Curated annotation (Swiss-Prot):
Its main location: secreted. GO terms for biological process: hormone-mediated signaling pathway; melanin biosynthetic process; melanosome organization. The gene is ASIP. It comes from Equus caballus. Residues 26-36 have a biased composition (Basic and acidic residues). Glycans are attached at residues 38-39. Disulfide bonds join 94-109, 101-115, 108-126, 112-133, 117-124. It comes from the Eukaryota. This is Agouti-signaling protein.
Length: 133
């Protein structure tokens, strides 16, 4: 009985390996050592070299000072460019054309417009029916 279980387990593992290997795309399949060496040498020549340098404390301080100067200068420019804004006028107690005018809202601003409601008074808007009133 143990031999049968061992055989079935081996068969199951081999089938799992076969299905996983057959579903790999061609570029994911393992290659031989020669092709790997050729690809790695070509990749090294194609990519640009990158050098990483550590910053010392002095250069960090200089960059922080430069950043603070930039912040200060931008704040000064922003404060100089501020212009007195005109006061916003209170909106008139009316609804502009094509805006919502549901019943508790005031009347339409345009004398030729009227409030039209659709879909059981759920969507209402001010519309101009005729240009000549």
């Amino acid at each position: 009985m143990d031999v049968i279980h061992l055989f079935l387990a081996t068969l199951l593992v081999s089938l799992c390996f076969l299905t996983a290997y057959s579903h790999l795309s061609p570029e994911e399949k393992p290659k031989d050592d020669r092709s790997l060496r050729n690809n790695s040498s070509m990749n090294l020549l194609d990519s640009p070299s990158v050098s990483i340098m550590a910053l010392n404390k002095k250069s960090k301080k200089i960059s922080r000072k430069e950043a603070e100067k930039k912040k200060r200068s931008s704040k000064k420019k922003a404060s100089m460019t501020k212009v007195a804004r005109p006061r916003l006028l209170q909106p008139a107690p009316c609804v502009a054309t094509r805006d919502s005018c549901k019943p508790p809202a005031p009347a339409c601003c345009d004398p030729c417009a009227s409030c039209q409601c659709r879909f059981f008074r759920s969507a209402c808007s001010c519309r101009v029916l005729t240009r000549t009133c």
